[in-house]
Amino acid sequence: DEFIEANSESVIASLAYWCSALQPLERQRILGCYSTDFELNVSIVTFNYTTLLPRLFHAFGTSDHATPEDSWGVSSIRLIHLVQAHGALGREPICGVNDASQIGSDALSKNEDIASTFVKGEIQKLFGSVDDRRAEDIILGANVLIIFGLSLGETDIRWWESVVKLLKKGDIHFVLIASTKAVSARRSPASFRRFSKALKEKLLTRGGANDDEKRLLSERIFIIPAGSIFRFKSHIPDAD
């Protein structure tokens, strides 16, 4: 429709802005591992159940697109994959907890029927879904992984564990957390240091990293403003 047509180019092309959103030393650290003017191959894992991102994805297409002039070192962008990790509204959306320990009752947590109803991984096994496996493959295959629009909550611990696995693969793998609070946190160096440290700690703790690992892995986690990427030209129209 008109909204998708008007926004697909700006939304997807804006993913190239992650590089210009970094601080100079952070950018230097990442670009030092890769040649500049590189082609950005993008795979998207979304926890959203709606059709919005898939429609934007398909409207943009999978051919090479030129990037905006100020996208810093990225010459072109191409979409590769999009996976709705927890299903979609039209096909068995997966809602629930990460594991049975998060069910607030010992009796209920040991009940197989309850587990197959409320534990995300068990629900996906029951329905024979491969969405979560495809999503994990994308995460573990990334060079630069951007976390956008997520609270790093306990019900998605298995995904944060995958993020930590990615960081452990080597020094050429990086994670960017796109935060809506990044701009306000930068009002002073001290406030941004505290904010950044807390966010990294939350991700690494949820991902199962030990203290020694946290010190090393946190050096390859950077915080960028959420407004840097996924830029819409217009608002989603209200339903009639």
What are these regions (language model features)?
Residues 1-130:
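Extended, H/D-rich, highly charged conserved domains that either
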